[in-house]
Amino acid sequence: MQFPLGFKLPDSVTEDYGQFFLRAMMSKDDQTGAVTVPTEVSQDEIFYMTRRDYALMVNGINRLGHQIKQQIGDKQPKLVFQFECCGRGKVFIREEQQSALLKSLHETVGSDVPWLGFFTYGEIGPLAGINQVHNYTCVMAAIY
């Protein structure tokens, strides 16, 4: 179960979020062909087997850092919380790649800021302004 399932997003949000809303495949039944995902799926819904892409991950992390910086302006955060999917951690990328992503975020948001990071399985964050449970993503909150 290395491949996330991608549910197609509406065109109105693809510029900010990409083409797919990713979900982890929790289990599969080889006899029936059924899979379990942590979301509601309508009977006729189409989803895609996707592949994780490090370059897209880098772009998303950079965009996230710049969004936070844009929201807080010239203010220095007092504390940053980072919730990183464990499926993106050592399972998918090497430790030096993870360190490079973190360094990029620190340089963008603030390198002298206390930073609390957590590996999670199911991150809660907005998608088109509505809080959603995500898989294979990074969610951050900056207190300033």
Where are these regions (language model features)?
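Proline-centered loop/turn at the N-terminus of a beta-strand
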Residues: 112-114
